[in-house]
């Protein structure tokens, strides 16, 4: 479970990085002045990205519960369909917050969506791949390669 907190911290660091990129004008937004930029960040980007992070954490938590319940089951490979189904929840959330904020993020929609997708990859895919228990840790897409990469960096798996 400590590994999922590590992926959450990495995701929050990247979130803060995107926040700084927008604030400092490195990624230009069609907002004039510091006041308009601060208003856009506090009204649109920050709440929507926190919603995506929260929903992704909830989906990860549900997956951990499912994998824990089937940790020694011989047919745990059947539970991978739940993993895919739970992945759709954060992706649907990304679509929803993007549609709701489309008028606010006209020229930066690609950058905002990119930051959302990074959160889902870090928290959900990598987090569940390295933190699932029992036999479930071997059935997720790319989990063996991710676990090998993470352990080669020196993080114990």
Predicted regions and their residues:
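Cytoplasmic juxtamembrane regions at transmembrane-helix boundaries
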Residues: 65-91, 143-157
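Alpha-helical membrane-associated segments of multi-pass integral membrane proteins
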Residues: 7-18, 101-157
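Membrane-helix interfacial "entry" motifs
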Residues: 36, 40-45, 74-78, 104-112
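Generic alpha-helical transmembrane segments
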Residues: 44-66, 88-93
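Alpha-helical transmembrane segments of integral membrane proteins
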Residues: 3-10, 47, 51, 81-85, ...
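N-terminal signal-anchor transmembrane alpha-helix
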Residues: 1-57
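Transmembrane alpha-helical segments in integral membrane proteins
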Residues: 55-73, 122-136
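Hydrophobic alpha-helical transmembrane segments of integral membrane proteins
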Residues: 78-110
């Amino acid at each position: 479970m400590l590994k999922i907190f590590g992926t959450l911290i990495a995701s929050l660091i990247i979130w803060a990085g995107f926040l700084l990129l927008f604030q400092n004008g490195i990624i230009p937004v069609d907002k004039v002045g510091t006041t308009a930029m601060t208003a856009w960040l506090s009204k649109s980007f920050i709440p929507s990205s926190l919603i995506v992070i929260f929903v992704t954490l909830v989906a990860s938590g549900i997956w951990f519960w499912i994998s824990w319940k089937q940790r020694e089951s011989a047919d745990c490979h059947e539970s991978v369909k739940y993993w895919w189904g739970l992945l759709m929840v954060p992706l649907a959330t990304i679509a929803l917050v993007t549609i709701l904020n489309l008028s606010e993020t006209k020229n930066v929609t690609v950058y905002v969506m990119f930051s959302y997708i990074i959160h889902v990859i870090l928290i959900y895919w990598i987090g569940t791949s390295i933190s699932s228990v029992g036999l479930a840790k071997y059935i997720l897409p790319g989990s063996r390669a991710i676990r090998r990469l993470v352990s080669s960096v020196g993080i114990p798996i």
